[in-house]
Amino acid sequence: MDKERKNDSKEREEGCKQSSKVREEGYKQSSKEREEGCKQSSKVREEDVIGTPKETPKAFPKQGKCRTNSGRKQDEMDRQNLTLLTDLYELTMMQGYYRNAHRNATVVFDAFFRNNPFGGGYSIMGGVEQLIEYIRELHFGAEDIRYLSSLGIFGKDFLDYLHDFHFTGDIYAVPEGSVIFPREPLVKVVAPIMEAQLVETAILNIINHQSLIATKAARVCYAAKGDGVLEFGLRRAQGPDAGTYGARAAIIGGCVATSNVLCGELFDVPVAGTHAHSWVMSFPDEYTAFKAYADIYPDACILLVDTYDTLESGVPNAIRVFQEMKKNGVKSRHFGIRLDSGDLAYLSKKARKMLDEAGFPDAIISASNDLDENLILSLKAQGAAITSWGVGTHLITAKDNPSFGGVYKLAAIQGQDGKFLPKIKLSENTEKITNPGDKKIYRVYEKATHKIKADLICLNEETFSEDKTLLLFDPQEPWKKTKMHPGEFELRELLVPLFQKGACCYTSPRVMDIRAYCNKEKESLWEETRRLVNPHQIYVDLSKKLYDTKIDLLSSLSQVDADAENIEN
C-alpha cells in the first residue's frame, strides 16, 4: 500500500494528464480478473447473501484483494479517492488528537439513527458495498496534502503523518438489505481515535443516502402488493451519484428494474423503459409512431397512450397495432400500454375493458406520473387496473422525508489496561442520550412464526443462548417485561466484520442477491409493522448489564453536575 501511495504521489507531481483514471498498481484490477476472482461468489449461498463473513484468515489479505460482486465497471465509479469527502472539523480534530497524549487511543464509534423515516415501522440497510470501497481507497495523495497545506491551519508534522496514513482498525456492520431499527449500531468502528474520527462524515453520507432510498423503495413496493415497481427517477435525482446509487438502493429495496443504464452496467441489475411523448410527436400520427415502435421492439412493446387523447386515440391505436402483430404471427412476450397523466384509476379501468374486449387480457397497463406509496395504495383501493408502476421523483429523492438522520457517536475508549471504558452523551432530549460501551446486536425471532420479536443490544462480552430463558424489557419503561423460554425463540447476531486490522475480510453479494435477501428480511416483519400508517414499532431492548451501565453513567454524571453546582453556590 505504501508503494502504491508513493507511486501515486510521483505521478501527480509529474503532472499526469490522465487524472480521471485510477493510477495505483493495486487499483488496476481488470474486469476479467474481477470476474475470475468472483467465480466462487457467483453462486451465492444463503449465508453469503445475508452477509456471513468469510473465515478469518491468520494473515489478512492486503486491501487490494478485497472484492465486490458488482458489474464490470465498478472500478470507474467506486474506486476513487474520497478521503477528502469529509467535514473540515474531522481534520482539525485529527490534528488536535495528534498533538495530545491520547492520539493512539483505540475507541469505539457507533453509527445509528433515531427514528424510522416516513413515519414507518422499519428501515432497510443500504450502502455497505460503497462503505467498503471508501475504506479500501482511504489515503491522502500529494494533491490532497498540498491543498490541506494551502489552508494554513495544518502543521507540517501533521501533514507528514497524513502522507503515510491508512486505516488500521476494525469495522462491523449490519449486512446490506437487512431490516433495521432505531438506536441500534448499524456500523461499529473500532480503531485509533484519529482514524475513527476521519471516517465519520463519509460513513454517514453513504449509509444515510442508500438506507433512505432502499427504505422508500420497500414502502412503495409494499403498496404495489406484488406488482412490479420500476425506478424511473434519474432525471429528477440530485446529481449523477444520487441517481445511480439511489437506483442501486431502490433495487435492493424491492424495485424490479431501473431506467438508469449506468446503474445497470455498474451493478448488473435489470434496466427497463418504454418511450417518450417525443417519439409519438416526431411521427405524422400516433398510429404510425406505435407501429414503428412495435416493428423495432416486438418483445418489449409498451406504448405510451396519452400524448393526444388516451381513450379516443391512444388506446384504440395501440389495440390496432396489437391486432396487426397478432395477425402477422408476431408473438410479443411483453406488450401493453403506459398511462402518464389524468385520472389513473378511471383511465386504467376503461383501458382494461377496451383491451379485454379486443382480445388482449394479457396486455400490461403501466402507470407513472408522480407516484408514491400513498398514491399507489389509493389507486389500489379504487380498483385501478394497473399492474406495473413507474416511480420516479418521489422515490429517488425520498421527497416527503429527504434525509435519513443517521448519527455517529463515541461509545467507548480503551484504557491503559486494554479494557474499553464506556462513554455516554447526555442531552436535554431523552431520545438523544446514547447507549454506551462496545456493543453488539441480537435479533430475537419468534420461533413459531419466524417473525421479529425484538432486537437486543448488549455489551460485546455478553452472550445469549436459545437454551436459556431470555428476559426482554423496554429500556424507556423497564417495568414492561417479557420472558421467552427455550423453544420459543431463535437468536441471530446482526453485526458482521467488514475490516479487521485494516484489511477487508468480507465479500459483498451481488445487488440482485442482496435484493432477494431483503425480500426475505421483509417477510420476517409482522404485517402490523409493515403497514404504511401508524405501524407497530418493534422493540429495541437493552440487556440488563448494558442498561445498568447506562444508568450508572447517567447517575455519576448527574452527581458531578450536582457537585459543581454546590461549589458555585
Protein language model regions, located:
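Glycine-rich phosphate-binding active-site loops on the catalytic face of alpha/beta enzymes
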Residues: 385-403
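Long, intrinsically disordered low-complexity tandem-repeat segments
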Residues: 9-46
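Catalytic cores of alpha/beta
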Residues: 371-385
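Glycine- and Gly-Pro-enriched alpha-helical subdomains that act as flexible
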Residues: 274-365
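Glycine-rich beta-to-alpha transition loops that act as phosphate-gripper elements at the mouths
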Residues: 235-237, 365-373, 392-394
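Ala/Thr-enriched low-complexity intrinsically disordered regions
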Residues: 52, 56-59, 68
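Ordered alpha/beta subdomains of enzyme catalytic regions
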Residues: 2, 64-299, 326-327, 333, ...
